């Protein structure tokens, strides 16, 4: 392992001991905000520190085994050779683990997420597939014990959604779901297709992190145009007969958010503002990323048929993840929310990109 990496790990070990001491300090315990921040830092350091201590132990085992090579006893020397081999393999494994643990963390990975699903090319079939993706994400959220809340929806004429925005609340929600951003293409025979021809439709998915209140960007009320209107619905006793739906336009960016799922205008406004903050923050994040790294691959596509991240082929039962050339013949399982088979390899590829960038920086 490089000396610079060792020094960094030693610094983290020292910091871990400092934080542990501070957590036992009465003045820190009395300050709940600081105590929570230090507790979070300690939990983040713990895994790296444990890995580094294991690395140090393996290094000590290797040195000890090398000393045994000086023994006169042939059997002892043979045993030493085996121990050296095992220690080197363990050091290699731990070094790879530590490199990943040292990768820069996205500070938003642990936040809640907003998922926007919009029907693109394909008309009614695109809206129906947008509904299928909503169901897929709902199942995935359920499997991860996350809470899912519909913020806004516009139903399709023949089922599904022209657009739906949901909030997913739970630990690590954004960190996993952020890789879903992009154009999702579906190939299948629509129920209304009498000739049995396969149609291609497109749906856009955009995933944004929630902006915590403490870090909320400042939105000038003068920059907002707020309209109220009557909620639309399928009819019946639950249709809202008052102007409780809200449409907020952020004039400087042109971002428009509508919320009409709640009966209360106040609740719809609060939801619309939280989505608006996330969208504005997403724009700022993208500007920053572009400035920092112009060659970075964007996770967000336009939703056009030609710009896709994933294809779902129903006749073949196939899912193709184009960003990493991954093909799975597990379409039914994926549509039922088994997304880890795709998100796991995507995360590994992302880590590999970060490791390559880190290696370039270190020369």
UniProtKB/Swiss-Prot annotation:
Predominant localisation class: cytoplasm
Entry keywords, A to Z: Cytoplasm, Methylation, Protein biosynthesis
Location relative to the cell: Cytoplasm
A molecular-function term among this protein's GO annotations: translation release factor activity, codon specific
Post-translational modification: Methylated by PrmC. Methylation increases the termination efficiency of RF1.
Region (Disordered): 284-306
UniProt xrefs under Pfam families: PCRF, RF-1
GO cellular component, one term: cytoplasm
Positions of modified residues (N5-methylglutamine): 237
HAMAP family on file: Rel_fac_1 (MF_00093)
Protein function: Peptide chain release factor 1 directs the termination of translation in response to the peptide chain termination codons UAG and UAA.
Family: Belongs to the prokaryotic/mitochondrial release factor family.
Protein known as: Peptide chain release factor 1
């Amino acid at each position: 392992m490089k000396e610079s990496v060792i020094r960094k790990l030693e610094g983290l070990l020292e910091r871990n001991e400092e934080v542990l001491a501070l957590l036992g300090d009465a003045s820190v315990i009395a300050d709940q905000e600081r105590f929570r921040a230090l507790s979070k830092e300690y939990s983040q350091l713990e895994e790296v520190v444990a890995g580094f201590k294991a690395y140090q132990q393996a290094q000590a085992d290797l040195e000890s085994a090398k000393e045994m090579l000086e023994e006169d006893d042939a059997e002892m020397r043979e045993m030493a050779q085996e121990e050296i081999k095992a220690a080197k393999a363990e050091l290699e494994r731990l070094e790879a683990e530590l490199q990943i643990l040292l990768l820069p963390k996205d500070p938003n990975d642990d936040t809640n997420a907003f998922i926007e699903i919009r029907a693109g090319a394909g008309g009614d079939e695109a809206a129906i597939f947008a509904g299928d993706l909503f169901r897929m994400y709902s199942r995935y959220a359920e499997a991860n014990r996350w809470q899912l809340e519909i913020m806004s929806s516009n139903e399709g004429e023949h089922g599904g959604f022209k657009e739906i925005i949901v909030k997913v609340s739970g630990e690590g929600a954004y960190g996993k779901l952020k890789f879903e951003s992009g154009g999702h293409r579906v190939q299948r025979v629509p129920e209304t297709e009498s000739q049995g021809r396969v149609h291609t439709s497109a749906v856009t998915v955009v995933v944004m992190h929630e902006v915590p209140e403490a870090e909320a960007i400042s939105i000038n009320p003068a920059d907002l145009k707020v309209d109220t209107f009557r909620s639309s619905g399928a009819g019946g006793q639950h249709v809202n007969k008052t102007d409780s739906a809200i449409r907020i336009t952020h004039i400087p960016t042109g971002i428009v958010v509508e919320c009409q799922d709640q009966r209360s205008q106040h609740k719809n406004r609060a939801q619309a503002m939280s989505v608006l903050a996330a969208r504005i923050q997403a724009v700022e994040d993208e500007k920053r990323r572009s400035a920092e790294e112009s060659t970075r691959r964007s996770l967000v596509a336009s939703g056009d048929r030609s710009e896709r991240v994933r294809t779902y082929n129903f006749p073949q039962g196939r899912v193709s993840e184009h960003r990493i050339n991954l093909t799975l013949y597990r379409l039914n399982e994926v549509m039922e929310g088994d997304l880890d088979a795709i998100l796991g390899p995507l995360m590994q590829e992302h880590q590999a990109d970060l490791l390559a960038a880190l290696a370039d920086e270190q020369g």
